């Protein structure tokens, strides 16, 4: 076993754009050999990938430290360990995921055709990763593509070049080179990739770039999964546990120095508890980083000067009052966690996703007002985080939309590796993780198989059409409504109970069994020898 280190690898280099069409052709041709479809092939790739990642763990830890200042602990928690567990989960469950499903909600007259759902791979796919979690957000979708039987090209983010070159090495050493390739680069290389025809594009990043990718994909009717972001609100009522709210929201916002698409972008807090909430935020900050964030080994850096400048400009443009933090250092890309009390929803800190350790607090006096404000700022954020009583949090969830939600926590839903994760509206489309990653790169193919003996029942579909056939057709296909002309339910209590207990399919079979039993009891001849 040889452990890989960063110094063992060549420097980051862009892929020549002239090489990109041949790379695309290579993975497309491989898919059409159908060799990526069998379970054995997929498992072989996943297992080889797992051990290559294990051997490259030191290099991956080094890379995330160099690119983002991440501690080894945080990198393992959110990157390396995450992907290793993802592969193990897929390996253990892949055979089950691949199995055909019996189609649900099929009428009795169609059951003889044995309708089922096959899980077919979509084809050759493109995965475009992001810099903030360069390993998880690149390799997570790739694991889904491999599991689904697709071939793939990965384009990691050029803003995390060290992680990108480690991933390229791992993939080249462990996966089938005819099926899985890496393209390095920035805008020119991404443009060249988008010039190719893919069977699916998976993109993680900003909404601005997501629109460009969606537009290019639409030209060839290529399906996309877009994992974007948004101005995610946390809503803290007067009944919330402020110590817990402060600790959980601060952790969510300081992870990766706030460069997390799903962390809260701002806090709507009941005006009566703002001073105490700020005090609890300060207390939690002191507990997390006793010597301060600048000296803390557990607090990273902003990824590059361009992003640091953007954050600094946001902070400079706010009309709010800085209550905590505010210290910065461009030379080291340090940006202190900064709590700002803002006066209204038009403040600069609430106009755009900060994607950094800025924590604006907007006071409210009425929960309905807070919900209205959150919807006005961004109607479809990636996440929403209500803190309060059950009644209050249920009210918030019932009157807002978001990709996901964590009640009384900061993005816990996004911390569960097997829970489907995705946006809604302009925070994204599609979902992945766990089984959803397999489904993301699979086509649910409906299949029937019509036996010859059923032809006499199918004569209703063949001309000439007669009144007799019409009566037969109605008898075979018409569904009786369970409501009257006034919209009232016509189901009796017993039927409602049976449906809730057995389900529609179960009730059908129960009725058939009862009819059969009655027939046998009444002396039906089954043609069986005694």
Residue ranges and their predicted role:
Residues 50-53, 57, 68, 91-98, ...:
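Structural signal for hydrophobic packing residues in well-ordered secondary-structure cores
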Residues 42, 87, 149, 180, ...:
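Residue-level signal for inorganic ion chemistry
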Residues 10-14, 175, 208-344, 407:
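ALDH superfamily catalytic-core signature
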Residues 38-41, 334-530:
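Conserved C-terminal structural/oligomerization subdomain of aldehyde/semialdehyde dehydrogenase
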Residues 106-244, 491-495, 509-523:
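Rossmann-like NAD(P) dinucleotide-binding subdomain of oxidoreductase/dehydrogenase enzymes
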Residues 1-116, 492-501, 518-526:
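N-terminal Rossmann-like NAD(P)+-binding subdomain of aldehyde/semialdehyde dehydrogenases
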Residues 184, 205, 324-326, 388:
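Short loop/edge segments at beta-strand edges and connector loops
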Residues 29-35, 127, 235-236, 266-269, ...:
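Short, well-ordered beta-strand elements within core beta-sheets of diverse protein domains
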């Amino acid at each position: 076993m040889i452990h890989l280190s960063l110094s063992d690898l060549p420097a980051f280099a862009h892929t020549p754009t002239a090489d990109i069409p041949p790379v695309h052709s290579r993975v497309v041709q491989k898919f059409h050999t159908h060799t990526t479809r069998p379970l054995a092939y997929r498992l072989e790739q996943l297992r080889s990938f797992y051990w290559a990642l294990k051997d490259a763990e030191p290099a991956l830890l080094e890379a995330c430290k160099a690119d983002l200042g991440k501690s080894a602990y945080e990198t393992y928690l959110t990157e390396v360990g995450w992907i290793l567990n993802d592969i193990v989960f897929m390996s253990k469950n892949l055979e089950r995921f691949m199995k055909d499903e019996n189609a649900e909600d099929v009428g009795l007259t169609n059951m003889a055709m044995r309708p089922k759902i096959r899980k077919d791979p979509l084809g050759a796919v493109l995965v475009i990763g992001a810099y903030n979690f360069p390993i998880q957000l690149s390799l997570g979708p790739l694991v889904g593509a491999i599991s689904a039987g697709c071939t793939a090209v990965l384009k990691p983010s050029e803003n995390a070049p060290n992680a990108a070159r480690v991933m390229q090495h791992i993939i080249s050493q462990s996966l089938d080179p005819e099926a899985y390739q890496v393209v390095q680069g920035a805008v020119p290389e991404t443009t060249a990739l988008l010039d190719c025809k893919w069977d699916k594009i998976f993109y993680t990043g900003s909404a601005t770039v997501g629109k460009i990718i969606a537009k290019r994909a639409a030209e060839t009717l290529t399906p996309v999964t877009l994992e974007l972001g948004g101005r995610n609100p946390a809503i803290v009522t007067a009944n919330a546990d402020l110590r817990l709210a402060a600790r959980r929201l601060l952790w969510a916002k300081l992870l990766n120095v706030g460069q997390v698409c799903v962390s809260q972008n701002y806090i709507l807090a009941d005006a009566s508890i703002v001073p105490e909430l700020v005090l609890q935020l300060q207390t939690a900050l002191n507990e997390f980083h006793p010597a301060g964030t600048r000296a803390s080994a557990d607090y990273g850096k902003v990824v590059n000067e361009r992003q640091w400048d953007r954050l600094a400009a946001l902070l400079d443009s706010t009309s709010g009052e800085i209550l905590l933090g505010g210290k910065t250092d461009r030379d080291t890309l340090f940006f202190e966690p900064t709590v700002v009390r803002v006066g209204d929803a038009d403040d600069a800190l609430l106009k755009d996703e900060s994607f950094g350790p800025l924590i604006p607090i907007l006071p409210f006096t009425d929960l309905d007002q807070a919900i209205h404000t959150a919807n006005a700022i961004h109607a479809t954020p990636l996440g929403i985080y209500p803190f309060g009583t059950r009644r209050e949090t249920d009210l918030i969830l019932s009157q807002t939309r978001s990709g996901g939600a964590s009640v009384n926590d900061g993005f816990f839903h996004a911390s569960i590796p097997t829970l489907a994760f995705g946006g809604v509206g302009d925070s994204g489309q599609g979902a992945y993780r766990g089984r959803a990653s397999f489904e993301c790169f699979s086509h649910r193919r409906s299949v029937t198989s019509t036996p010859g003996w059923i032809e006499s029942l199918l004569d209703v579909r063949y001309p000439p059409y007669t009144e007799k056939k019409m009566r037969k057709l109605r008898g075979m296909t018409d569904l009786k409504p369970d409501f009257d002309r006034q919209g009232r339910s016509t189901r009796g209590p017993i039927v409602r109970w049976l449906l809730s207990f057995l389900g529609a399919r179960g009730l059908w079979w129960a009725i058939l069994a009862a009819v059969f039993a009655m027939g046998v009891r009444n002396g039906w001849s089954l043609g069986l020898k005694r």
